[in-house]
């Protein structure tokens, strides 16, 4: 009996130890499960309590006081509310959106409102802004945070009219599309056939900017504005861009490129607002000493002669706004306005008088010499030229010159084959116009592009072992295609208007005969 007990004792002890360890592991697992259940239960209880809470209201913080109260605009009225001690004092910034808990106390700061009405800044006065809505009504609001330091006149801001706060500056896409602030990459060397006109505008624009001290010595005031006018497609916009680029070589100019038709807006006063914003921006930049060029393309679309409107007659308000801004340009010093138009007779005379757009430069159609100069910018020896043609002419340079001359000869020949239209005047006389009378820089560039396309198609068709490069037949075909595509453009329903646009309206035109190519 003793032997059995002593034999079984150690074995029983080991079993008890194993069982004890197993029970301990189970107990630890039960404790872990119990803790997880308790956490889950607390989470569920928290959700139930949150569901039982009344809905929160929000308001705009007007002012935080030292006695843990705050002035809050909520539900359309101003209220003084208690601030929860859990809310950090440094977050209580006027203009911030706050959440109100049960009992109408501030329990959380949720940041700045990111929605509201859009208004235009008219004036910045300390931490207050004078703003105007889309119908022109002005009112005063407070600027939240550092907004007053960030905005300038003409900027758009998000406002809450009821609380009287402006929260954030908003970029206006339509205004940004009208303004190209970067300096264009067009130089005078890129413009051919307009040497005299380039000299005129350089004398009018660049000299006063580059040598102001000499103008002061002579008591000569620089011109406020320049009008570039003439038939379409002859380089008016290119010249304005080249002016800005030239000034950039000695200074850092600001180029505002305004597309006239895009400023038009159906809302009363909106076009005038944008004009004010543009010139305010120009004056602000000019005050730092930088030259500013405000370029109005298609000027006749905006500033037509007053009294010629058919319905709204918006010219009666838009033109005076521009006149007021032009009269204010002199005070700015470094601002000059350049306008471009192919219908200069439609622009209000008050804009064109001396003292506003002082210098008027006609950009006429190129003659044969000017056309060759323009073509030299688009067709030179750097282009692929047919090897046989290059060998026949002696060099790539000679071949390119021959191709250019071929285009000029084809366009500027005045014979029956090259007659374009016949104008019939009211006095019974008539006048024949030829291809040469309708040549423009844009047309010449398009002819070269057509010739390149034909050469590319031939190269693809002939393969690697075929001929490659520009040939005379390419440029000749391009000329015929360009003229042929234009033969349906003359407006026979209103011949006088069409002739005037294209610079041939010396007398009253009553009819047009178009001669097919």
Curated annotation (Swiss-Prot):
Key words of the record: ATP-binding, Coiled coil, Nucleotide-binding
SUPFAM superfamilies associated with the record: P-loop containing nucleoside triphosphate hydrolases
Any single Gene Ontology cellular-component annotation: proteasome complex
GO molecular function: ATP binding; ATP hydrolysis activity
Source superkingdom: Bacteria
Binding site for ATP: 233-238
Coiled-coil features, chain-numbered ranges: 25-53
UniProt record, GO biological process: modification-dependent protein catabolic process; proteasomal protein catabolic process
Pfam name, any one: AAA
InterPro entries: AAA+_ATPase, AAA_ATPase_domain, ATPase_AAA_core, ATPase_AAA_CS, NA-bd_OB-fold, P-loop_NTPase, Prot_ATP_ID_OB_2nd, Prot_ATP_ID_OB_N
Assembly information from the UniProt record: Homohexamer. Assembles into a hexameric ring structure.
Family per similarity comment: Belongs to the AAA ATPase family.
PANTHER family: AAA-FAMILY ATPASE, PROTEASOME-ASSOCIATED ATPASE
Record-given protein name: AAA ATPase forming ring-shaped complexes
Record organism: Corynebacterium jeikeium (strain K411)
């Amino acid at each position: 009996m003793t032997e059995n007990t002593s034999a079984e004792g150690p074995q029983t002890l080991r079993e008890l130890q194993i069982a004890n360890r197993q029970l301990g592991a189970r107990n630890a697992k039960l404790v872990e499960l119990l803790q997880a259940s308790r956490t889950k239960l607390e989470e569920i209880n928290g959700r139930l309590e949150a569901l039982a809470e009344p809905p929160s209201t929000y308001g705009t913080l007007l002012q935080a006081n030292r006695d843990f109260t705050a002035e809050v605009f909520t539900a359309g009225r101003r209220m003084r509310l208690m601030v929860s001690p859990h809310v950090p004092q440094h977050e209580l910034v006027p203009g911030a959106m706050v959440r109100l808990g049960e009992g109408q106390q501030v329990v959380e700061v949720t940041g700045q409102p990111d929605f509201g009405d859009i208004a235009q800044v008219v004036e910045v006065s300390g931490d207050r802004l004078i703003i105007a809505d889309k119908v022109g009504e002005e009112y005063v609001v407070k600027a939240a945070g550092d907004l007053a330091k960030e905005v300038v006149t003409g900027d758009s801001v998000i406002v809450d009219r009821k609380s009287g706060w402006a929260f954030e500056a908003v970029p206006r896409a339509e205004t940004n599309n009208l303004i190209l602030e970067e300096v264009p990459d067009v130089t005078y060397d890129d413009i051919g056939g307009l040497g005299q006109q380039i000299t005129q505008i350089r004398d009018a624009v660049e000299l006063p900017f580059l040598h102001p001290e000499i103008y002061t010595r002579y008591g000569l005031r620089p011109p406020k504005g320049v009008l570039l006018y003439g038939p379409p497609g002859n380089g008016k916009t290119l010249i304005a861009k080249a002016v800005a680029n030239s000034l950039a070589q000695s200074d850092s100019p600001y180029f505002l490129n305004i597309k006239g038709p895009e400023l038009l807006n159906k809302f009363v006063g909106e076009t005038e607002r944008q004009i004010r914003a543009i010139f305010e921006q120009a004056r602000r930049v000019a005050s730092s000493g930088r030259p500013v060029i405000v370029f109005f393309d298609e000027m006749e679309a905006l500033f037509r002669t007053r009294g010629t409107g058919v319905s709204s007659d918006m010219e009666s308000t838009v033109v005076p706004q521009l006149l007021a801004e032009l009269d204010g340009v002199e005070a700015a010093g470094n601002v000059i306005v350049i306008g471009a138009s192919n219908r200069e007779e439609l622009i209000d005379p008050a804009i064109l008088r001396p003292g506003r757009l002082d210098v008027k430069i006609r950009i006429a159609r190129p003659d044969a010499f000017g056309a060759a100069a323009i073509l030299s910018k688009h067709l030179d020896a750097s282009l692929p030229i047919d090897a046989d043609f290059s060998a026949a002419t002696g060099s790539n340079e000679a071949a390119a010159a021959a191709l250019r001359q071929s285009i000029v000869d084809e366009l500027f020949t005045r014979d029956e084959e090259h007659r374009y239209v016949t104008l019939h005047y009211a006095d019974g006389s008539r006048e024949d116009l030829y291809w040469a009378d309708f040549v423009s820089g844009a047309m010449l560039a398009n002819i070269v592009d057509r010739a390149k396309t034909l050469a590319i198609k031939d190269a693809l068709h002939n393969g690697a072992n075929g001929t490659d490069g520009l040939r005379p037949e390419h440029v000749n075909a391009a000329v015929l295609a360009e003229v042929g595509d234009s033969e349906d453009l003359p407006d026979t329903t209103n011949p006088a208007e069409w002739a005037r646009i294209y610079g041939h309206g010396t007398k009253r035109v009553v009819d047009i005969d178009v001669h097919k190519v």
